[in-house]
Amino acid sequence: MIENRSFSFVDCYGDVGDYYTKPAWGYGWNATKECGEGRMEYVTGSPISRVNPWYLRFTAQDAGQGFWNKAYDGIYLEKGKTYTVRFYARAAQYPEGNITVQVTKDGRICAQAEVSCIHAPEKTWQKWNLYEAALEAGETIRNGRFTISLTKPGTVEFDLISMMPDDAVAGVFRKDLFDLLKGLHPGFLRFPGGCIIEGNTLENRYRWKESVGDIKDRRTNFNRWAVHLTSEENGWHTQYSHYNQTLGIGFYEYFLLCELIGAKPLPVLNVGLACQFQSYELVEMDEPEFQEFLQDAVDLIEFANGPADSTWGSVRAKMGHPEPFGLTMVGIGNEQWQTEKIDFFGRYQAFEKAIHAKYPEIKLIGSAGPDITSEHYDKAWEFYKKEVPARDNFCYAVDEHYYVKPDWFYAHTDFYDEYPRDVKVFSGEYASHPISGMNLPQANTLGGALAEAAFLTGVERNADVVVLASYAPLFARVGYAQWSPDMIWFDETKAYGTPSYFVQKLYGENMGTVTLAMDGQEKELRKEQVYANVSLDERTGDLILKVVNHNDCEKTLELDLGSFRAAGTAKNVILTGEGENAYNCIEHPDSVKLSECESNAADGIVLPANSFVVTRIPTVR
C-alpha cells in the first residue's frame, strides 16, 4: 500500500540501447505542514541493508511534525478492518518522545496508533529497530493520507515502511486478487512474467536470487515497463517513469502462491540476453559471466526442490517452507530468437546440458520467438524438430506468443490440427486485441473473449500437442497499465474479472480427460460461425461441450450423443452481454457475466447471440 517504501526508487529514461535512471529517493514522500514543515533528508551511511543503502533522516523542529506518502492513489480503508504497519527506525537524536502513525482524510483521523520509540543512552550506538503498529479503520475512505509523525522535536531515521491489510493471504497477497486467481482453477502459473526477466539492460534484469531471503535485503530495481513507449516527443520519459520493483513478491512468494492456488510453478530464466526488442546487450557464451546464468538455473531448482540442509534449500527452509515446492518445469528464456549475432539455440543447449546433468527430470520450455508469423518462428521449430528426436527430454514444449486481432483467432481455430506430434507446444502468451494501448479496460471486450474461446476449442481439440496454455497479461491496475487488454483489472478498492477471465474460468472448471472426435462436424459448424469442441470427463461420465456462437442471432445446436446416453439434465453455463463491444469496468463489473440454466439434451443447446456456452451432460454408455 506504501509507495517507495525503502526510499530507493529511481526515475527512468531512454530508448532502445540507451536507458538510464536518475535518483528519486524521495519520490512519493512529502513533509506534512499542519504543525510546520520538518526537514526530510535522503541519506546513506548506516543502512539496514547495503542492498538498499538510502533511507530517510527526518528532523522535527516542533512536536507533531511528520511526513506522508503518496500511496499510489491514496490509502483505501474499510471500516472495521485492521491494517498492520511495519517500519525500521533509529532514534538518531531523539532522547524522548514516541512515533505516531495515522491515516487521515480531509484533516480527520481515520486510523491511528502510537508506538514507543526505543531511545539509546547518549554516546552509544543507535541501532535500527523494527516497529509494528495495528491500525483499525474507523470508517471507510478512499484517497486517505498515510502519515508518520514525531510527538517531540528531534531526529529519527526511517526505512522499509510497509502497510498491509490483515486479511492478506499468507500476509502477502491481496485477498480479492488472490480469490479471483484461485477461482480460475489454473493448472500452472508462469512467473514472474516475460520481458521483465530480460530487462531493458542486463543490469535491470530480474535476478531471482535477489528476490528471496529477508525482505530488507531485496534490491529495488527499476521496471522494464517504466520506459515503455518513450519517444522524442515525450523526452524519452513517460508518466510511468517511477515504475520500480521492490520485489516484495519474489520467487519464494511465487512458489508459495502456486501452492496455495493448486497450480504448478513455471519460472522463467534469463539466458544472458537483455530484451531483444529494447537492447543490444548480451553476455557472450565464452565469457566467465555466462556461467553465472547457468548456475542460477541449477540453483533455482535446488531452491525449489532441494533438501532443507542444502545451500539453497536451506534458504527456502529459513523462509518458512522446509518441504520442497515440487518444481517440474523451467522456461529457458522468454521471447528469444536466433540472429546473426545471437546464438539463442546454442544458449538453450548450454542450459539444457547444465540442468539435465543434475536434474534430468526437469521439463524445459523452449522459445519460438516473439510471434508465430516470422522467420524467427520457422527457424526455432526447425531447431527443436531436429534436436528432440535424439533426446526425449531435450525440450518438453516450445513457447509460442501471439497477441492478435479477434479475426485471426476465428480464422485459426484449426491452427494446431496439422502440427507434428513429436514436439509439444506451450501457448505461453496470447490474447485477443480488438484495440490496444495504455490504460484501456474497454479493450477487454466480449467480442475479444469470444474469439479466444473459439480458438481454445482448437487448442483443446489438439491437447495431445498443446500441453500448456496461458493468457497474458494477468493483472492490471486501473490508471497504471502500460498494456491492454489484461485479464483482471483492479484499483485500490476492488477488482473484477474481464470477459476473458470468464473464458479462462470456464475452461479451467470444465476440463475433460479425453477429447472426443467430431468427425469433421467442427469444420461444417465453422462455416456458420459456430465453434465447438467435445470432451469426456471419465471421472464423472459427463460429456462437456464448449461452443461459441459468433453470430448476432440465436442458434440451436442439435445433438447426437452416439454411443452415449443422457443420464440426467444438461447443465449450461453461458457467457454473454449486450453485444460484442460490451466490457466490464470498476463501475460496472458485471456488464458481461455468467448465467446458468438447465435443459434437456434431446432438445439441443440454445446458443444466444454472441455467446460462449459450456454444457455438461451426465451420460452412461
Model-predicted regions and their roles:
Residues 87, 185, 258, 300, ...:
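Conserved, mostly hydrophobic/aromatic
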Residues 591-621:
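C-terminal beta-strand-rich structural cap/linker in extracellular carbohydrate-active enzymes
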Residues 150, 192-195, 271, 276, ...:
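Active-site groove signature of glycoside hydrolases
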Residues 138, 166-186, 246-261, 288-329, ...:
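An active-site-proximal structural segment forming one wall of the substrate-binding cleft
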Residues 529-566, 572, 610-613:
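Carbohydrate-binding surface patches
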Residues 353-356, 387-392, 396-510, 538, ...:
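Catalytic-core region of carbohydrate-active enzymes that cleave or remodel glycosidic bonds
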Residues 312-320, 356-377, 424-429, 465-476:
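Aromatic-lined carbohydrate-recognition surfaces of secreted/lumenal glycan-active proteins
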Residues 1-246, 264, 282-291, 341-342, ...:
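Extracellular and organelle-lumenal recognition/adhesion modules and their flexible linkers in secreted
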